[in-house]
Amino acid sequence: MDKPVVRISVRNLVEFILRSGDLDNRGGSSDREAMQKGSRLHRKIQGRMGSHYRAEVSLKYKTEYEDVSIQVEGRADGIFTEDGQCWIDEIKGVYADVSQLEKPVEVHRAQAMCYAWIYAQEQKPEKIGVQMTYGNLDTEELKFFREEYTLEELGLWYQNLLDRYHKWIAYQFAWKKERNASMSDLEFPFEYREGQRKIVSGVYHTISTERQIFVQAPTGVGKTMSTIFPAVRAVGAGLGENIFYLTAKTITRTVAEEAFSILKEHGLKFKVITITAKEKLCFCDKTECNPENCLWARGHLDRVNDAVFELWTTQDSYDRDTLLEYAKKWQVCPFEMCLNLAVWVDAVICDYNYVFDPNVYLKRFFGEGTSGEYIFLIDEAHNLVDRGREMYSAHVDRADVLEAKKLAADYSKGLVRALEKVNRQLRTLEKECTEYEILPNPGAISLGMLQVMGEMDKLLEELHGKELPEQLLEFYFCVRDFLNIDELLDENYVVYTEMGEGGKVILRLFCVNPAANIHRCLEKGKSAVFFSATLLPMDYYRALLSTRKDDYGIYVTSPFRQENRCILTGRDVSSRYTRRGYEEYHRIASYIARTVWTRKGNYMVFFPSYKFMEDVLEVYENEFSAEWVRCISQTSGMNEREKEEFLEEFSASEGTLVGFCVMGGIFSEGIDLMGEKLIGAIIIGTGLPQIGTEREILRQYYDKKGVNGFDYAYRYPGMNKVLQSAGRVIRTQEDTGIILLLDERFTGKDYRNLFPAEWSDRGNCTLNTVEEQLGSFWNRIREKN
C-alpha cells in the first residue's frame, strides 16, 4: 500500500517548528501597500543581479519515513554563483532601518537553509552559501548577511528539523486510524424522533455530493445531533476531514459540546475544541498581548509547541477549563494556544467570525490559497444574515480621523500628512451630505486610507514594540478593516455617507447582500449545512446566504402535538407607531392581565423595543397588578450574571411570574425553559426593525432588484424575531403552553403566509374573548391529564 504524502511549504515548516520569542501585538500587520512594495523590491533586486541570477526557482524534496513521505516545497527568491560558489538568496522587505540590523531573523535564515539543502540534492556541491538580503521598503537601502555550510552540516540540520515535524505527523496519522475505526459501528445515540431521520439522511447526502443544504426544523426535533452525527459518519467514510460547528451564541456552543460528548460515550474517538473569545480566556484584566504587560506573552513562542503537543496527545476534548489548565502549566497565552491546537483537531466549535470575518478568520484554514475537506455546520443560520452584513461592512468617521491626526503629531509627520489628506477628502463629502448620500464608490479615499495604513505600519515597525496610544491603535484596526472591505466592493455593496452624532461625516461601505462573501469562505471547504428553527421564507435566506443554484432544502414539521398548545392572534390590537399611546398600552396590558389570570404559571411578554416595553409595564403595574403576580423586566446591556439571575427566576417561581422582554434580545432565542418554567409567550407586534438609513437603503436596493424591498428590509427580519420569541414555549413532548400574537397585522395574508405549517390551527381572539378561549384550552389540558 502506498504511503501517504504530506506536503508542506518551506515557510510554513520553519515558522511552525522554529517559532520562538514573545507574543507582541504592538507591531503592524502586512497591508496591501507593504505587500506591493515588497513585490516591487523583490523584482528590482532580482533584476539588477544580472543574467547569472536565477529568480523565483521552484524547489521540492521528498523525505521517506516508515509511515509517511514528507514533501517540502517552495520557491527560492534567487540562486546565483559567485567565484565558483553557489548561493541561495532570501529577500525580505522591511520598514526598519536596515543599517541597524545586526543579524538575520532565525526563520529567514532557516528558509534559506532549507532551499540550500534541497538545491544541493540536485547539484551536490561541497559547500553552499545562504544570503539573507534585507531591503528597506521606502529607501530601498540593502543589507546582506552571508553564511556558508557544508552538505553534512546542512543535512544534519535539515534532518533534525524534519524529525521534529514528523513527530506531529506520525501522531496525526495514528490518531486518524483510531478515530476512523471508532466510527465503523457508530449508531445514532437515541431513538429517532419524527423528522430526525430525514435530517440525518439529507445532511449525509449533501456532504457526499459536496453541496449545501438549508434545514428548517422547529424546536424539539434535535437539530444539533441530527447534523453532527451524519457529519461525523461522513468524516469516518472519508467524505470530509474537519467539522466546523459555527454558532452565533454561547448557549448553542454548549449544546454542540454535549452532542459530541454523547457520541463519545457511545464509542466515538474525536478531538473537539471550542474556541472561546480572547477576553474570556485571558489571564490578565486587560488583553494586552505583549511581553511588557503580560507574563504569558513573554517567551510564549518558545513553549507553545510543547504545550500544544502534550494537550493534543493526552486529551480529546478542549473546553475553556482544559485550555486554561494547560496554558497555566506551560505559561503560555491560552487563546493563542487554542488557535494553534485547532489546526490539529477533528472538530472546531466556534463563533461565525472565525470562518467568515475577514479580520478574524482562522488563516491556517481559510487564508489565501488554502482550502481543505471541511464540513460546515451553521447553527441558528438566520443570524448569519445580519452578522454577515456586519462582518463585511466598514466605515471611516471624520471625527476619528481628526482625533488620530492629533495623536499622531507626537510620532510621525508622514502619518499626519496622510491623515490630513483623508480629512480633506471627507470634508468635501461632508459638504454634500444632508441626511445620507449614496455614492458610486469611495473614490480617492481608498488610496488615501492605503497611504495612512502604510505610514502606520512604518511607525509601528520603527517603534520596536514601544506602545502607541490605545486610541491610535484602535484607529489602525479601523483603517485595516476599511481596506479589507474596500477590496470586496461589488454590486452587493452600497457606498454612502451620513452625518455622525458629532456633526462629522461618516463614509460607509455597506454590504447589503453577504451571500457572495459567505460563498467565498464556504468554497474553501466541501459542504455546508445551514439550519435553524426559523429559516422562513427559505428563498429569502437562500438569496442572502448562498449564491449556488443547486442547494438542497428540507422542511421538517414539529414533532409536538398541536393539542398541547394554543396559538391565538389578537385582531383588535396594534403596535403601529401611529396607534401608540395610553389607549393601546392599556389594551395590551389588559390582554397580558387576562392571559396570566387564566392560569397560574410563568409567562414572557416580548416587545419591539425597550421604550414600548417600559410604557406598557408602567400601565400594567399601575392598573392591573395583583399580589400573586410578580413582574420582572429585561434591561439594556445585561451581563452574563444578570442574564442568569433573570432566567433563574423562572425556575424558582411558584406563583405567577411575568417576564417583560424585548424581541430579538438575549431572552428571545437560545434559551430552554422547559415544562412549567414557561407556559406562555405573548408577542406584541410584528417585530419590524426601526426605520433608519440602513433599512431604507436595503428596501431601495431590493426594490431595484425586482423583489419586494419592504419584505427584505422589514417584514422578513421582523417575522424571524416573532418566530424566535414564540419558540420559547413548548420545548419537549410533555410541555403545554399558549402563544398570543397581539397585532391585527398578523391576520393579513402577508403575515399568514410566513407562519410555519404547524400553526395551521391558529385562532383569532379579541380582548373580550381571550379569557374564555384560553380557559377552554387549559380546561382541556387538565381533563386530559
Q: Which role does the model predict for each range below?
A:
Residues M1-Q85, A110:
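Metal-dependent nuclease catalytic cores that hydrolyze phosphodiester bonds in DNA/RNA
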Residues Y61-G155:
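Mg2+/Mn2+-dependent nuclease catalytic core
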Residues A174-Q216:
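Conserved pre-motif I regulatory segment
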Residues L186-E187, L239-V348, F356, K406, ...:
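A substrate-engagement module of RecA-like helicase motors
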Residues S208-P230:
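Walker A/P-loop
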Residues T227, T254, K328-A347, D351-M456, ...:
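Signature of the SF2 helicase/ATPase Hel1-core->accessory helical subdomain module
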Residues L323-V348, N359-F366, L459-S574, R579, ...:
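A contiguous, basic/glycine-rich beta-loop/short-helix subdomain that forms a polymer-engagement track
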Residues R571-E583, T635-F746:
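Conserved RecA-like P-loop NTPase helicase motor core
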